[in-house]
């Protein structure tokens, strides 16, 4: 059975940690795997300044969704202008993804369900009904005081 066509694939720029990050992320999410690793050739090494034979890209799937990581050097860094959102069905899932992805990350970057992982990539760990919850002023007020989202507290504040 062939994989469905995906029009959009996140492409993440790392300094030298593309394969390490792919291994880390695929260890956290179900239905995840590294699908390909490419290495810098003599030609691409000369053009990029990256060592010949070192990892250039790591293609992987997170819960079946394609992602590519590039070892492009220190030129570009992740920032909060882009984040990956993980929709969670219950508090146990929120706790799991929050605990795994925040490990080694920046605790100062944790607010309102957002976290920054050890590679500097921002994630939002949210309940599946976050869009409905943030339509309620009580839920939003509760969220403003949270780091990791507490679904029960947000729902209680919505009533």
Task: Specify the residue positions occupied by each region the protein language model found.
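Core segments of cupin and vicinal oxygen chelate
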Residues: 2, 12-64
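A short, polar/charged loop-to-alpha-helix boundary motif
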Residues: 130-145
């Amino acid at each position: 059975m062939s994989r469905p066509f995906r029009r959009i694939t996140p492409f993440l720029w790392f300094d030298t940690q593309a394969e390490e990050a792919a291994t880390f992320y695929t260890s956290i999410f179900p239905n995840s795997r590294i699908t390909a690793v490419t290495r810098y050739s003599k030609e691409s090494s000369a053009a990029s300044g990256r060592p010949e034979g070192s990892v250039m890209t790591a293609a992987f799937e997170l819960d079946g969704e394609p992602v590519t990581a590039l070892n492009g050097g220190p030129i570009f860094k992740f920032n909060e202008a882009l984040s990956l959102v993980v929709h969670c069905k219950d508090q146990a899932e929120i706790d799991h993804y929050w605990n795994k992805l925040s490990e080694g990350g920046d605790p100062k970057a944790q607010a309102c369900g957002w976290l920054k992982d050890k590679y500097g990539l921002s994630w939002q760990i949210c309940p599946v009904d976050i869009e409905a919850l943030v339509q309620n002023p009580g839920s939003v007020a509760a969220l403003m005081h949270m780091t990791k989202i507490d679904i029960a507290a947000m729902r209680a504040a919505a009533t």
